[in-house]
């Protein structure tokens, strides 16, 4: 039997299930107790009672699961998470489980790669496969009896994983070196070489070796033509029987319609023969119907009574 790196004074847990032979379990525990000595401790846990045992976090240095000779133990995600919880930071898990060599999504038995992924998802690091070995006829029979699974593609795989050197959810204050900001009055030093690189003097403008681009040469004759206002209008601007400018019109149609509206208002204003009726009685004719009425604005609507009309 491998010693799994167990030394004196360490706390070790052995996880077993109903498929584990009693004599084999007792023999394994005796060998482990000899390695841990009086200062260490070896705990034996049934896999179905592990979640109910309520061990404190970081209770064990090493956990051996499914390693009792003759065991055919399967590990669920909950069991693996509990094992990771009760392992001490830096502690190791050694696990043995029957796996399928062919992928079968309907099988309760995982493949070796899926088992390694499950260990990683439980929070363990440095997960690696140690060895593979075929099942004996007795172990095949045990898988059939205890797991209700029958397959010709089974083998045992032994995997190890390590808990990180910190507790899940632990925190630590970071020491940040914050430098004091320089005073606003202190200006940063200017690199003379950089300043010279970005400086363009008048002498440079007269240098024939300087290749300066005339911006006017970048324009085509078409660019210099004044555009026709009609060409700037949107395709749908002013369509329909009633011309109407778009909202936030920029093509000039709104101003054009406003001018047309002003001309219509001016043409619709009433005109008198003399054109002075609105100025007051001093400017009105003798026969003006507005005699006696105060001055009014041009185009203002004025109502005449029947008596005024008869007098006129």
Curated annotation (Swiss-Prot):
Residues 6-172 are annotated as: N-terminal SAM-like domain. [2Fe-2S] cluster binds at residues 237, 246, 249, 251. [4Fe-4S] cluster binds at residues 274, 277, 285, 288. In the presence of oxygen, the A site-bound [2Fe-2S] cluster is labile and the B site-bound [4Fe-4S] cluster is readily converted into a [2Fe-2S] cluster, a reason why recombinant protein is often isolated with a single [2Fe-2S] cluster. Keywords: 2Fe-2S, 4Fe-4S, Apoptosis, Cytoplasm, Iron, Iron-sulfur, Metal-binding, Mitochondrion, Nucleus, Phosphoprotein. One of its GO terms (molecular function) is 2 iron, 2 sulfur cluster binding. Monomer. Interacts with NDOR1; its oxidized form can be reduced by NDOR1. Interacts with CHCHD4 and may be a substrate for CHCHD4 chaperone activity. GO terms for cellular component: cytoplasm; mitochondrial intermembrane space; mitochondrion; nucleolus; nucleoplasm. The twin Cx2C motifs are involved in the recognition by the mitochondrial CHCHD4/MIA40-GFER/ERV1 disulfide relay system. The formation of 2 disulfide bonds in the Cx2C motifs through dithiol/disulfide exchange reactions effectively traps the protein in the mitochondrial intermembrane space. The C-terminal domain binds 2 Fe-S clusters but is otherwise mostly in an intrinsically disordered conformation. Residues 274-288 are annotated as: Fe-S binding site B. Component of the cytosolic iron-sulfur (Fe-S) protein assembly (CIA) machinery required for the maturation of extramitochondrial Fe-S proteins. Part of an electron transfer chain functioning in an early step of cytosolic Fe-S biogenesis, facilitating the de novo assembly of a [4Fe-4S] cluster on the scaffold complex NUBP1-NUBP2. Electrons are transferred to CIAPIN1 from NADPH via the FAD- and FMN-containing protein NDOR1. Residues 237-251 are annotated as: Fe-S binding site A. 'Ana-mors-in' means 'anti-death molecule' in Latin. This is Anamorsin. Ubiquitously expressed. Highly expressed in heart, liver and pancreas. Residues 173-224 are annotated as: Linker.
